[in-house]
Amino acid sequence: MGKGTGSFGKRRNKSHTLCVRCGRRSFHIQKSRCSACAYPAARKRTYNWSVKAIRRKTTGTGRMRYLRNVPRRFKTGFREGTEAKPRSKASASSA
């Protein structure tokens, strides 16, 4: 039997599983290394020959739960835990 179409029916073991850092199914179980982000290496795997891939994965393509609010909070100098001063009646009646 060759390595072509007939052999694909015999392939039943997963070599890759989910990566805890990038979430893709690229973590090689035996090597303990992610082929997409190079986890557990400290530096994330990116190459400039795959500009399109960088564009797909870069900041801004996901939820950005924290980063989405930073520009708004920056305007007020990241103040927290304060209450707005009550407006005076003069400005309220003129409006």
From Swiss-Prot:
Transmembrane segments: none annotated. Keywords: Metal-binding, Ribonucleoprotein, Ribosomal protein, RNA-binding, rRNA-binding, Zinc, Zinc-finger. It comes from the Eukaryota. Zn(2+) binds at residues 19, 22, 34, 37. Residues 73-95 are annotated as: Disordered. Pfam families: Ribosomal_L37e. Disulfide bonds: none annotated. Residues 77-86 have a biased composition (Basic and acidic residues). A zinc finger (C4-type) spans 19-37. Its cofactor is Zn(2+). One of its GO terms (cellular component) is cytosol. GO terms for molecular function: mRNA binding; rRNA binding; structural constituent of ribosome; zinc ion binding. One of its GO terms (biological process) is translation. The keyword Glycoprotein does not apply. InterPro entries: Ribosomal_eL37 (IPR001569), Ribosomal_eL37/eL43 (IPR011331), Ribosomal_eL37_CS (IPR018267), Ribosomal_zn-bd (IPR011332). Binds 1 zinc ion per subunit. Belongs to the eukaryotic ribosomal protein eL37 family. Binds to the 23S rRNA. This is Large ribosomal subunit protein eL37x. It comes from Arabidopsis thaliana (Mouse-ear cress). The lineage of its organism: Eukaryota, Viridiplantae, Streptophyta, Embryophyta, Tracheophyta.
